[in-house]
Regions:
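Hydrophobic anchor at the start of a short beta-strand
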Residues: 22, 65, 110-112
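Conserved PLP-binding active-site segment in aminotransferase class I/II-type PLP enzymes
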Residues: 1-41, 82-84
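A short beta-strand submotif of the Rossmann-like class I SAM-dependent methyltransferase core
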Residues: 24, 46, 90
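Active-site phosphate-binding strand-loop segment of PLP-dependent enzymes
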Residues: 71-113
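Short, polar loop motifs at secondary-structure junctions
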Residues: 12-13, 49-53, 95-96
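Conserved PLP-anchoring active-site segment centered on the Schiff-base-forming lysine
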Residues: 35-81
Length: 113
């Protein structure tokens, strides 16, 4: 099966960048790899409903992963107690799950990707 990529055309706007000191990366996969390397995570919890290419950065960085199930509302079915070298990856499917993202951020803090 061919993956549908997360690359969108470059939008140029007038004025300065919103975050002038930001690091600019070209794909979600590259952003994920950067986070894995920068934070030094050893294990990531990742939803089963995830594009196969998101496993590439995990393999490349030697990071272990464990899949978790989501319910019919695209929310995790289980909560984890994370070690300091672990992270929880959540996909905000179609940008509709802001309340869920907020709950997960309150639970996992900076360990939420």
């Amino acid at each position: 099966m061919k993956e549908i990529g997360g690359y969108f055309e470059l939008e140029l706007h007038k004025g300065g960048h919103y975050h002038p000191d930001a690091l600019y990366l070209n794909t979600g996969r590259n952003c994920f790899e950067y986070i894995l390397r920068a934070k030094g995570y050893k294990k990531v919890y990742i939803p089963y409903y995830t594009c196969e290419v998101m496993l590439e950065p995990l393999r490349k960085c030697g990071v272990k992963w464990e899949f978790y199930h989501i319910n019919e509302d695209f929310e995790p079915l289980i909560s984890y107690s994370l070690a300091t070298d672990e992270a929880f990856l959540y996909t905000n499917y179609w940008g509709l799950k802001q309340a869920c993202v907020k709950r997960l951020a309150e639970r996992y803090g900076k360990q939420l990707i």
